[in-house]
Amino acid sequence: MSLTTTQPPGPEMGPAKSDLRRGSLPHRFPAALLAATAAVVAGVLLAFSSFGFVLWGLLTAVAYVVIVVTASARVEGGRKARDRLVTTLVYGCFLLAMLPLVSVLWTVLGNGFARFDPYFLSVSMNGVLPSMDAGGAYHAIVGTLAITGLATLISVPIGVMTAVYLVEYAEGRMKRTIMFFVDVMTGIPSIVAGLFVVALWIILFGPGATNGAAGAIALAVLMIPVVVRSSEEMLRLVPQDLREASYALGVPKWRTITKVVLPTSAAGLTTGIMLAIARVIGETAPLILTAGSSAVSINWNLFDGQMMSLPVFIYSQVRMGGAVNYERAWAAALTLILVVMLLFFLARMIGRLFAPKAR
């Protein structure tokens, strides 16, 4: 009886390499290819006298994707080519998302910088005719900060405490009902909030009672659901282990919330509040109805007389027309953007200040 030993088949040594063993394109190849493609497409469009930034960008993107994917497939293999295709699409979507923001900032900066100076920020429109090359937005800046500040004082305690109730206490049908109405309030048009406050003010103070406090309440109606939803998400991110550790030490629930949960989520809560402020600081329709649109002097009293705000100031200047008024409107728009950026910077600082310190 003889035994035969069968050797296992060896690996096939074909000429084709695996995708994982293919070569790779040079590190700077994508950037160089993009620059070359953009230059070639621009030259072709200029040669046919049909150059346009939109058409140039579209053709450059299509040509770049086709060339880079084809080159990657031939040199690096199909797997790497698919990876480059998806990566290129992700970067392209990011650029498309950033394009409107950059365009808005560039347009506002280009048109508003000419009149944006200390004089514009330190004087009001009191005694200034629409055709005069004078006046500024100081009264509108004061009104914006005052109205938004009061709206924040109203909405933040209500919104944060509602979020605490939803996360720590509410259950079942009550929780679902509150969340449903919060979601409904999130989609309320701003003009509806303004009409609601106008109707309330007519009942309480009679017709024609417009002041900054009414505008603040209208903005608070818009802010509360945003604060609730953002605060709820931040409170849910607090690890349950921190709560359990506090309970194990005999700390009551209310003290656990105030000493553990809220400080731990302070940075996120601050960011959510700033998002809510950014959501309402540019509202125009409710403030026209509630705070008025004809104030030209500085008003420090939220409860007496009309109060101008930056969005309403922009609207009134554009409505009057004329080159000088348009310049004031652009400068006010730039001021509003800078105010929002400053508020976000302050929010970051406050969030870092109250965030729990690592030991």
Regions found by a protein language model. Name each.
Residues V54-A61, G135-V164:
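Transmembrane alpha-helix signature in integral membrane proteins
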Residues D83-T88, I158-V197, I224-E233, K357-R359:
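Cytoplasmic-entry segments and transmembrane alpha-helices of multi-pass inner-membrane transporters
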Residues T152-G172, R176, A209-A248, P252-V260, ...:
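Membrane-cytosol interface at the C-terminal ends of specific transmembrane alpha-helices
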Residues D183-L219:
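Generic hydrophobic transmembrane alpha-helix motif, especially the helices
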Residues L235-R236, Q240, Y247, T271, ...:
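C-terminal transmembrane helix and the adjacent membrane-cytosol boundary/short C-terminal tail
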Residues K253-A291:
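Transmembrane alpha-helices
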Residues L287-I337:
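Interhelical loop and adjacent transmembrane-helix boundary motif
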